[in-house]
Amino acid sequence: MRLASQSAILVKVWTWNASRNAWKASGGIFDIPQKETRLKELERRLEDPSLWNDPEAARKVSQEAARLRRTVDTFRSLESDLQGLLELMEELPAEEREALKPELEEAAKKLDELYHQTLLNFPHAEKNAILTIQPGAGGTEACDWAEMLLRMYTRFAERQGFQVEVVDLTPGPEAGIDYAQILVKGENAYGLLSPEAGVHRLVRPSPFDASGRRHTSFAGVEVIPEVDEEVEVVLKPEELRIDVMRASGPGGQGVNTTDSAVRVVHLPTGITVTCQTTRSQIKNKELALKILKARLYELERKKREEELKALRGEVRPIEWGSQIRSYVLDKNYVKDHRTGLMRHDPENVLDGDLMDLIWAGLEWKAGRRQGTEEVEAE
């Protein structure tokens, strides 16, 4: 079948058609068979009345099931629609196929949306985002650049229908900002903003230089997910082994020789707490459980700290050689050094038009896009 050369949409759909058998065999980038298996497992859990004894666990299971159901249903519907369109195209003469362009464009749009969902399939992607901006090398120019980035991300959030809450803001000594932290609220806010973390470089004739000379300045952006503040520790009876034994200690009239000492073992972690402080077995048990909860709390807190450290990624100095993206205003371009993507409309980028840069960054993070981190001298 000859493709209509004027319709890039047909190329996209036929690319899908040529590879769909491989997708069915392996699950492809969409991993639909795996998602369907996981969805069935979650639906079985939701039917278990005991799950609802823990409202927070039930909420998380419900949310995951809803996301998976949305992806699976969209894929199956799209698969059916595309199959029908492709069969119809096979039957039509070449000159009549262009009439299907609106339907093909809609199918291609849905295909893109589904593909983008696969790029947001990582921990905490669905959560709100905490975004922090700090100026680096460049003095007043860098402080102004940090404020420009703050506006850029605020405009991006507005374009996506997200809410922005200023958490902390410190003005610069002369202009701009010395520090800013905002909370971006919306579905997938963290997922979308996560590839923006890193050092951003600005090159322009400086408005703070009376001679109008070209200046280079830097600002660092950190993006982390908003997570639950409280570390909740739930002691499940089936995860505990409680032993009662005779208290031990130095001899004497006041020695506790009753079977009041209590040892509590937390089976999943192996943490053991023994308490023989009082002659009351009940009080010793209560104290042992309190100590166990405290130790589990600390264990979970450290785990979250390590997870947050991993999410922050490598901390690079906010200076030359560390940048992920350059905004060169006098030469009218923005270049992402990880993905190689270049834009020639920096005014739109700085007004929050970031989606192509973000999708490219997510592809790069997922290992689906090759770029270069080489930075040319300006």
From Swiss-Prot:
List the SMART domains: PCRF
- What are the record keywords, sorted? Cytoplasm, Methylation, Protein biosynthesis, RNA-binding, rRNA-binding, tRNA-binding
Please give one Pfam family short name.
PCRF
Q: Name one GO cellular component term.
A: cytoplasm
Question: What GO MF annotations does this protein's record show?
Answer: rRNA binding; translation release factor activity, codon specific; tRNA binding
Residues modified to N5-methylglutamine: Q253
Read off the SUPFAM superfamilies from this record. Answer: Release factor
| Cell compartments where the protein resides | Cytoplasm
Q: What does this protein do?
A: Peptide chain release factor 2 directs the termination of translation in response to the peptide chain termination codons UGA and UAA. In endogenous ribosomes interacts with P-site tRNA and 23S rRNA. In the presence of truncated mRNA in the 70S ribosome, ArfA and RF2 interact such that the GGQ peptide hydrolysis motif of RF2 rises into the peptidyl-transferase center and releases the ribosome. Recruited to stalled E.coli 70S ribosomes by E.coli ArfA, but cannot be functionally accomodated in the peptidyl-transferase center. Note T.thermophilus probably does not encode arfA.
Q: How does it assemble?
A: Interacts with the ribosome. Interacts with ribosomal protein L11. Recruited to stalled E.coli ribosomes by E.coli ArfA.
* Family to which this protein belongs: Belongs to the prokaryotic/mitochondrial release factor family.
Q: What is this protein called?
A: Peptide chain release factor RF2
